[in-house]
Amino acid sequence: MAAIVETDNGYKKFVEESLASGSVRENTNRTIDGIKFVTFDCPVNPNEPAITGILSSPGDKTWTLINIMPRLPGLAAEAEVQGTCRWEMLVLGEVALSLGHTSVTAVVPNFDLVKHLMQPGTKRYFRLSATVEDLAVREPTPIIVNEGPLYEMELESFLKENPGKTASDFEPVEISTVGMQMLFPRDYSTIFELASPVLSVKHTKLCDRDIVRLEVILHRWEDEEIRTYLYGTPSQIPEGVKEGSEVHGLIRLYAEPIAETFN
């Protein structure tokens, strides 16, 4: 790190803003494929999850690659592993999950340390979280349906219940979008378009940085509901968002496998 700081002023500024003393968590030193993994406890917020660093010394080079990725506290949900993908940078990876009646792909922090927990076909609990890519307040506007199967079904019911009426007397079907939840994949595997009501808002800190945590609904199907925490900086969260607000935007999903099993 010292060598990089001496030769890269931009990196030096980044380090100066982020640097804090810390301690290596016991029994976390591991070497996988020549890469050393160590976990540091956060000295600023002891109750927050640890920061994990990956150190590598390729060949006979004199520099060291360091990557720091904060873990985002998430909400637990049971999922079935469909497959995994390791990133070329040896830092992170992705996991494809069957989550209730939907499927998602999520970034996995510390991928090499936990990939043994994510064998395809296995079911286990994951801590799910998300970060804001782009977010806006959604004003619920009704959807007007004036054609298609739903319209035809409602029209048929209307004519049966109202003898003497005709199709010209039937108003288009209006569907309320208050409390609407949706999740659609976008261009990149771990990016999704989300619409959800906001269940709670909390202003907190992560690695001594101000962040906002929104509790949102990731997936809903009949009586099945899966929630997650959505994180963003204050500038990423639309002004005036509060419990009961409705939001719509792009998010990036994260999933952390839980080693413990539950009956």
Language model features with spans:
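OB-fold (S1/OB) nucleic-acid-binding surfaces
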Residues: 95-99, 103-104, 199-228
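A structural signal for the main folded, soluble domain(s) of proteins
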Residues: 190-193, 205-207, 235, 243
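Short nucleic-acid-contacting surface segments enriched for D/E, G, S/T with interspersed K/R
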Residues: 233-249
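Short, charged beta-turn/beta-strand-edge "cap" motif at the junction between a beta-strand
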Residues: 4, 10-11, 245-259
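Long, hydrophobic alpha/beta structural blocks
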Residues: 30-187, 191-197, 211-212
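N-terminal alpha-helical "arm" segments
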Residues: 1-29
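C-terminal output/interaction extensions
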Residues: 226-230, 257-263
